[in-house]
């Protein structure tokens, strides 16, 4: 056994001596690992070109992307294109709309530029604008600033000259700047001077220079006068063209001021002192009637404040003085001392009531004012209540007479409901007279014995005007009496 192993080991020893040639006793044997020599494989020694490994399934789907470094981008030039470019197909909305035409001259944002025709204005402070659209494109230059035609004024007082116009230019902050057109100088006197001063007052709220030399009242009172004159000019249908007519308008509007101040205003404009005819003085006397304690000038009456045909709510500027009628006081001087003391006490109590009424802030004439509130009852008449037949018609009649107008109140006193009992005058019209003549109210004989009131009521009854067209119409004082009885009877049943 030992000999066999020895022979087997000697065979491997002879193979090592062979140098690894593989030609020993065992030709099919491999040389040992230590005798192998490895060399790197060079691609140049290969006779067959190598092929890349087969791509995976995911890599076969997209095509191979070229390297970015090999791409060269050049700008597209229209000259290199042989086929003319066509616009992209329009959207569904663009296919429905017709093609928009080019904007011609005279259009602004696709809309015809309107032309404003300025027509001569014969009525003071009543300028109207007529705007129409041109039939075709017109050449218009776009204005650089917004201009407003403010007012028209008459240059002369002869009535034959054409009115002139001026514009007020506003900047981006809506502030009035220098007018574009040069204004003519102010006339020294006459109707044209008064109208020019009223136009300037609407812009500056300042009275004309030189007026203080003719009047004695303070500046606040002068501003109040011109506010009343401006409101009177806007209310009248035909403005005065002669100095005499303008003097009557000024005297009627400023009737409550002192006579020296009224004469000073008339002298400032060169107006004559007006004389009132006998017919006018019969119904509308220049002097305050007997029994009037105070005179008040109201702000424009709101139509919603007229509750029925004989009552409404009025507001009076707190800057307007409450004028005590000195002539009534003087008439009482000749009487005995008891009546004089009674009149003084009544006037003092009424003045306290006038001054202690509620106040409210209001806008008038472009400024904020503080006004007193007064509940007014028309003296001497009684109109149907709203719940009665012909009550709404009577209320509408009073609305047409005084709504949006300034009225003059002749205060006689207060009734049991703390309302101020007054005669009402508006634009030279006695309101109670109009209500009675047209049949919108009854003469309240229990509280007023004036004979002209009975005369005006008889005229309406004979002509069957207003409420007199109805037969057996219930009187308002009887209606109120029956209503009070029904209320007392209902209260007794409840108890």
Swiss-Prot record:
InterPro entries: SNase_OB-fold_sf, Staphylococal_nuclease_OB-fold. Residues 45-68, 81-101 are annotated as: Disordered. Keywords: Calcium, Cell membrane, Endonuclease, Hydrolase, Lipoprotein, Membrane, Metal-binding, Myristate, Nuclease, Palmitate. Residues 50-66 have a biased composition (Pro residues). Its main location: membrane. It is a lipid-anchor. Its EC number is 3.1.31.-. Residues 297-470 form the TNase-like domain. Ca(2+) binds at residues 310, 382. A lipid is attached at residue 2 (N-myristoyl glycine). It comes from the Eukaryota. Enzyme that catalyzes the hydrolysis of both DNA and RNA at the 5' position of the phosphodiester bond. The active site is at residues 377, 385, 419. This is Probable staphylococcal-like nuclease CAN4. Pfam families: SNase. A lipid is attached at residue 11 (S-palmitoyl cysteine). It is an enzyme of class 3 (hydrolase). Belongs to the thermonuclease family. GO terms for cellular component: plasma membrane. Binds 1 Ca(2+) ion per subunit. GO terms for molecular function: endonuclease activity; metal ion binding. Its cofactor is Ca(2+). It is found in: Cell membrane. It comes from Oryza sativa subsp. japonica (Rice). Coiled coil: none annotated.
